[in-house]
UniProtKB/Swiss-Prot annotation:
The gene is INTU. Coiled coil: none annotated. The keyword Cytoplasm applies. Belongs to the inturned family. Plays a key role in ciliogenesis and embryonic development. Regulator of cilia formation by controlling the organization of the apical actin cytoskeleton and the positioning of the basal bodies at the apical cell surface, which in turn is essential for the normal orientation of elongating ciliary microtubules. Plays a key role in definition of cell polarity via its role in ciliogenesis but not via conversion extension. Has an indirect effect on hedgehog signaling. Component of the CPLANE (ciliogenesis and planar polarity effectors) complex, composed of INTU, FUZ and WDPCP. Interacts with CPLANE1. Interacts with NPHP4 and DAAM1; INTU is mediating the interaction between NPHP4 and DAAM1. This is Protein inturned. One of its GO terms (biological process) is nervous system development. Residues 186-264 form the PDZ domain. GO terms for molecular function: phosphatidylinositol binding. Residues 710-719 have a biased composition (Low complexity). GO terms for cellular component: cell surface; centriole; cilium; cytoplasm.
Length: 933
C-alpha cells in the first residue's frame, strides 16, 4: 500500500493552464458562461503543455500508486475558522486588528501558509518543524518566512514588499456620486473582478487581488516595483482579498507610508515551469487520520485497550528447531490486550487440527473468556496455513465475524494473489499493518468513521454496517432510464478505447492494456457497472476496506488516483471445462485503476497480455489511461445535479416511520414527526392546518393479530435458528416465526375521534389527490392493503452482485424516538436470519456436488422447496416515558427474511407493522421487477 500524500498545496490558487486538478470543485462553472467555461478541461490540454501529472512522484518502486488530493472545500474545513480582517487601526509603530476573535493579538496568517496549517492541525508535520516555528509571534513580513539564500546565487523571490505613500485626502477631490474604489484612488492599482464572481455573488474569503492595470500617476506606478500580474496579498502584513480590501484601506487615518506585499508574477510563472522536486512522502496512517478526524489518537488508544487480534499461523512446525513463536507468520496489533490472545494460540491450532480429523469438517469459529469478556475467534484455513481474527462479542456478533474473515481473505487474495504472498513477504508488513488498522477501526468504532456526517447518518451507517458491509453485493441506486443511458454511453465510449492515444493506429503499435470493464460510483452508491459480478464484488470489497466510498460521499475528494496490480478470481481460477472450444482466459496480468473526482469514483479493470502488450516488471499507471478516465468523469459533470434530485426525491418504495404507529395518548401526538412522503403527494392542497400530514394513532382502527403465512406457521424450516439478536432493553422479541397464532401480540387501542386525518388511509386522500397522484402513490407503495406499513427493507440480487436499500436521505426523513432503534434491530435480526439462509444454500450446493440430484442442477433441487422464510415479531415502546399513570404505548412489527432459490438466488428482508397481513412474494416481485444494471 503506497503512502498517502495530502497534496492540497500542489494546486496554485490560479491553477495551472490545462491542468485538470486546477479545475476541481469549480462551483462557479456554468456551461453558458464564456468566462468560466473557457477554463474547462480538455483531454489534450495536458499534452500541449507537457506537464508532469501531479501524482507522478507518488508512484512506488513496485508500480503501485495511492494518491489522494483533498477538495478545496475540505481544505477549508480542516483549517481553524479565522474571520476575515474587516477593520484595523494603523499607527506609526503597529497595526491593531479590532476583532473580538483576536483578543490575544494573533494576526491572521497569509494564505501561503494554509497548507502548512492543515498539516500542523492534522499533526502530520515532523516535530522539528513545530519547534522551529514555536517562537514566531507578532506581525512580521512575509519575506522573513523564506529560506536563507546562498551567497553568490541570484534568486527571484516569490514575494516582495513595496512601500508607497498613501494620502486619504485624495478622496475629497472625487465626485460624490462616483462609486469609490480605494484600491484605485489610494494605491493606483486596477483590479477587475471576475464576471462569474459578480454574477453569482460569491462571498466568503473573496478572490485574489491580481494587478490587471496601473493607474497613471498612481503611487503603485511611481514606485516602479509593481508589475501587471502581481498579486496583492497583504497591506502592512494584514491579509487582503477582494472581499475586505476596501474596508482595510478605509481604516487608514491620514497620509502615511504603507507596506504592500505582492506575490511576484515573474517568480510564480518561473516556478510553474520548473520541474517539481520529489515531495516528502507522508505516512500511510494519514488516511486513518483523514477518515476519523482529530480524535484519531484517542480512538486508536481505546482500540488498543480492547482485546482484538489477527494472526497468520502455520500448521507445519519444524521439530528440529525450537524457535519461539516460529508458527507465527504475522500478527497485529502489538499491544498488551492482543498479547494475551497471542499467548493461547496453541489452543486454536489444536482445535483446528483435532476437530477436523474427528468431524471431517473445518472449524469456523470458537469463543473464549478473557478477563470476563467473551471473545469470538474466526478461522480461515488454506492448505497448511491458518488465518485467525479475534474480536469482542459485545462489539461484533459471531455471524458478522464469519463474514468479515471471508471478506478479508477475499480482499487479500485480490490484492496479492494468495494469502501466502500477502503474509510471507517482509515488504508487505507495513501495508498489512495499515490494512488491519483500518479494518479494526471500522469494526470497533463504526460510528466514528464519518466524523463530518450528521449524528443520524453516523447512527444509520453504524447500525446497517452489521449486515450491509458483508453482503456479497454493492449498494445500487436506481435511476431514471435517461440517466442510465447517458452513464452507459460514457462508460462504453471509454471501454471501447478506439480513439486518440488509446487507439492502436495512433502509435502504430499494440495497445498497452485492454479495458475489461468499469463501474461508476456516486456518493458511495453504484450507479453504473459493466463488470462481471465477481470482478464487481472484488473491487467493491477493496474500496470498502480502504474506506474510499465514505470519502466520495462527502465531496472530500479533489482528486484520487489508485493503481495496483490485482488478481481477480474470475479470471485467474482454472477452467473446469477441458473442452478446447470453450473460451480460455489468456495468461495475462490485471491492473486496477481508480480515479475519483468530487462525488464520482470510476473503477476500471485493465488486462495486459492477450490482445494487449505483455506487462514487463512492475509498470506504473499510464498517463494516457488516467487522463481518459478523468475526461469521462468531466463529461458527467452535468449529470450529478439530476442524480442529486433522485436522492432528494421521495422514497421509492414509500416508507413509514415507526413512531407514527404508536398507540398512545393524545398528548403524544405533538411529538410525532411530519410525514415528508405524504406531504410531497399533497402538494398545494391543504387537508388541515399545518402540519398537514401527521400520522394518526390508528384511533379509529382496531389492530389485529398478524396472521402467520403458511410457511411461517410451523414446520422444521420455519423457525429462527442460530444466535439470539442483541436488542434494546425496551424492545422485546415477542414471537418467532415458528410460534403459534395464540401467542401473538394483541394491541388494544381506545376508540376515539381522530385528531388529524389519517394520511395513510386512501379514503381521506381521494378528496385531495388527483388521479395521477393516486397512481404514483399506489405504484411506489410496496406493501398491500389500504395503508403503507413498510418500515425498512434490503433486497439482495446475488446474480448481478447488487443490493438495494433505503438511501441515507430517505432514512433521514423518518426521524423519531423508536425508528432508529427499529433500524438497528432490523439489521441485527437480518444478520441472524441470513446465517440460516447461508446454511441452507451450502446444503443445497453440497447436495448438487455429491450427485444426490441426478440432473446436477440447482433448479431441480430447489424446486422441491423453492422458498425459505424466517421472521421475528418485536414489540417496542418509547425509551423515555414520563407519564407514570399510564403504561407506555406499544408497537409491534415483523422482521421477515425470504430466500429465493429459483429461478435465481435472491434474498429479501423487510420490516413492517403487524397490523396488516402482507404477501412477501408480492413485495419481492415489486422490488425485483426491472432491477437490472
Amino acid at each position: 500500500m503506497a503512502s498517502l500524500p495530502l497534496c492540497g498545496s500542489v494546486r496554485s490558487p490560479e491553477g495551472l493552464p490545462g491542468d485538470p486538478s486546477s479545475q476541481e470543485d469549480r462551483q462557479d462553472y456554468d456551461p453558458e458562461d464564456p468566462v468560466s467555461g473557457s477554463g474547462s478541461y480538455s483531454p489534450t490540454s495536458t499534452d500541449s503543455n507537457d506537464l508532469e501529472p501531479e501524482w507522478l512522484d507518488s508512484v512506488q518502486k513496485n508500480g503501485e500508486l495511492f494518491y489522494l488530493e483533498l477538495s478545496e472545500d475540505e481544505e477549508e474545513s480542516l483549517l481553524p475558522e479565522t474571520p476575515t480582517v474587516n477593520h484595523v487601526r494603523f499607527s506609526e509603530n503597529e497595526i491593531i486588528i479590532e476583532e473580538d476573535d483576536y483578543r490575544e493579538g494573533k494576526k491572521y496568517e497569509p494564505k501561503l501558509k494554509r497548507f502548512t496549517k492543515i498539516l500542523k492541525s492534522k499533526k502530520l508535520l515532523p516535530k522539528r518543524y513545530n519547534k522551529k516555528n514555536s517562537n514566531a509571534s507578532g506581525p512580521v513580513s512575509i519575506l522573513k518566512h523564506q529560506s536563507n539564500q546562498k551567497m553568490g546565487v541570484i534568486v527571484q523571490q516569490r514575494h516582495k514588499d513595496v512601500n508607497i505613500y498613501v494620502n486619504p485626502k485624495k478622496l475629497t477631490v472625487t465626485k460624490a456620486k462616483e462609486q469609490l474604489k480605494l484600491l484605485e484612488v489610494l494605491v493606483g492599482i486596477i483590479h477587475q473582478t471576475k464576471w462569474s464572481w459578480r454574477r453569482t455573488g460569491k462571498q466568503g474569503g473573496g478572490e485574489r487581488l491580481v494587478v490587471h492595470g496601473l493607474l497613471p500617476g498612481g503611487s503603485a506606478m511611481k514606485s516602479g516595483q509593481v508589475l501587471i500580474g502581481d498579486v496583492l496579498v497583504a497591506v502592512n502584513d494584514v491579509e487582503v482579498t477582494s472581499e475586505n480590501i476596501e474596508r482595510v484601506l478605509s481604516c487608514i487615518p491620514g497620509p502615511m507610508q504603507v507596506k504592500l506585499t505582492f506575490e511576484n508574477a515573474y517568480a510564480m510563472k518561473k516556478e510553474t515551469t520548473q520541474p517539481r522536486q520529489k515531495k516528502a512522502q507522508l505516512n500511510t496512517s494519514d488516511l486513518v487520520k483523514l477518515l476519523w478526524g482529530e480524535e484519531v489518537e484517542g480512538i486508536q488508544q481505546n482500540i488498543l485497550n480492547t482485546p482484538h487480534i489477527v494472526m497468520y499461523l502455520t500448521l507445519q512446525l519444524d521439530s528440529e528447531t525450537s524457535k519461539e513463536e516460529q508458527e507465527i507468520l504475522y500478527h497485529y496489533p502489538v499491544s498488551e490486550a492482543s498479547q494475551k490472545l497471542q499467548s493461547v494460540r496453541g489452543i486454536f491450532l489444536t482445535l483446528c487440527d483435532m476437530l477436523e480429523n474427528v468431524t471431517g469438517t473445518q472449524v469456523t469459529s470458537s469463543s473464549l473468556l478473557l478477563n470476563r469478556k467473551q471473545i469470538h475467534i474466526a478461522y480461515w484455513k488454506e492448505t497448511d496455513k491458518l488465518l485467525l481474527i479475534g474480536l469482542p462479542a459485545e462489539e461484533v456478533p459471531l455471524p458478522q465475524l464469519r463474514n468479515m474473515i471471508e471478506d478479508v481473505a477475499q480482499t487479500l487474495k485480490f490484492m496479492y494473489g494468495s494469502l501466502d504472498s500477502a503474509f510471507c513477504q517482509v515488504e508487505n508488513v507495513p501495508r498489512l499493518d495499515h490494512f488491519f488498522s483500518l479494518f479494526f477501526q471500522r469494526a470497533l468504532q463504526p460510528t466514528k468513521l464519518h466524523s463530518s456526517a450528521s449524528p443520524s447518518t453516523q447512527q444509520y451507517d453504524a447500525s446497517s454496517a452489521v449486515l450491509l458491509d458483508n453482503l456479497p453485493g454493492v449498494r445500487w441506486l436506481t435511476l431514471p432510464q435517461e440517466i442510465k443511458l447517458e452513464l452507459d454511453t460514457a462508460l462504453s465510449d471509454l471501454e471501447a478505447a478506439d480513439f486518440a492515444e488509446l487507439s492502436e493506429d495512433y502509435y502504430d503499435m499494440r495497445r498497452l492494456y485492454t479495458i475489461l470493464g468499469s463501474s461508476l460510483f456516486y456518493k458511495g452508491y453504484l450507479i453504473c457497472s459493466h463488470l462481471p459480478k465477481d470482478d464487481l464484488i472484488d473491487i467493491a470489497v477493496y474500496c470498502r476496506h480502504y474506506c474510499l466510498l465514505p470519502l466520495a460521499a462527502k465531496q472530500r475528494i479533489g482528486q484520487l488516483v489508485i493503481w495496483r496490480e490485482v488478481f481477480p478470481r474470475h479470471h485467474l481460477q482454472p477452467s473446469a471445462d477441458s473442452n478446447t472450444e470453450v473460451f480460455q482466459e489468456p495468461e495475462g496480468r490485471y491492473f486496477l485503476l481508480i480515479v475519483g473526482l468530487r462525488h464520482y469514483m470510476l473503477c476500471v479493470l485493465l488486462e495486459a497480455g492477450g490482445c494487449a502488450s505483455r506487462a514487463i516488471g512492475n509498470p506504473g499507471p499510464d498517463c494516457i489511461y488516467v487522463d481518459q478516465v478523468k475526461t469521462t468523469l468531466h463529461q458527467l459533470e452535468g449529470v450529478d445535479s439530476r442524480i442529486n434530485e433522485r436522492l432528494a426525491s421521495s422514497p421509492t418504495p414509500c416508507l413509514s416511520c415507526a413512531d407514527w404507529f404508536l398507540a398512545g395518548s393524545h398528548e403524544k401526538l405533538d411529538n410525532l414527526t411530519t410525514s415528508p412522503i405524504l406531504s410531497r403527494l399533497h402538494g398545494a392542497s391543504r387537508v388541515a392546518t399545518s402540519p398537514t400530514c401527521r400520522r394518526t394513532l390508528f384511533s379509529d382502527y382496531s389492530l389485529k393479530t398478524r396472521k402467520p403465512s403458511p410457511s411461517r406457521s410451523g414446520g422444521p424450516d420455519s423457525g429462527l435458528e442460530g444466535e439470539g439478536v442483541g436488542l434494546s432493553p425496551h424492545t422485546t422479541e415477542s414471537q418467532g416465526s415458528h410460534g403459534s397464532e395464540e401467542t401473538g401480540a394483541l394491541l388494544k387501542v381506545t376508540k376515539k375521534k381522530s385528531a388529524l386525518p389519517n394520511p395513510f388511509h386512501l379514503g381521506n386522500l381521494k378528496k385531495d389527490l388527483s388521479e395521477k397522484e393516486l397512481d404514483i402513490y399506489n405504484t411506489v407503495k410496496l406493501t398491500s392493503g389500504p395503508e403503507n406499513t413498510l418500515f425498512h427493507y434490503v433486497a439482495l440480487e446475488t446474480v448481478q452482485g447488487i443490493f438495494i436499500t433505503p438511501t441515507h436521505e430517505e432514512v433521514a426523513q423518518l426521524s423519531g424516538s423508536i425508528h432508529p432503534q427499529l433500524i438497528k434491530n432490523f439489521h441485527q435480526c437480518c444478520l441472524s436470519i441470513r446465517a440460516v439462509f447461508q446454511q441452507t444454500v451450502a446444503k443445497e450446493k453440497k447436495k448438487a456436488l455429491n450427485g444426490k440430484d441426478h440432473s446436477g442442477s440447482t433448479n431441480s433441487v430447489s424446486s422441491l422447496n423453492p422458498v425459505k422464510e424466517h421472521g421475528v415479531l418485536f414489540e417496542c415502546s418509547p425509551e423515555n416515558w414520563t407519564d407514570q399513570r399510564k403504561a407506555p404505548p406499544v408497537m409491534a412489527y415483523w422482521v421477515v427474511g425470504r430466500l429465493f432459490l429459483h429461478p435465481k438466488l435472491q434474498e429479501l428482508y423487510v420490516c413492517f407493522h403487524d397490523s396488516v397481513t402482507e404477501i412477501a412474494i408480492e413485495m419481492a416481485f415489486k422490488l425485483f421487477f426491472g432491477l437490472t444494471l
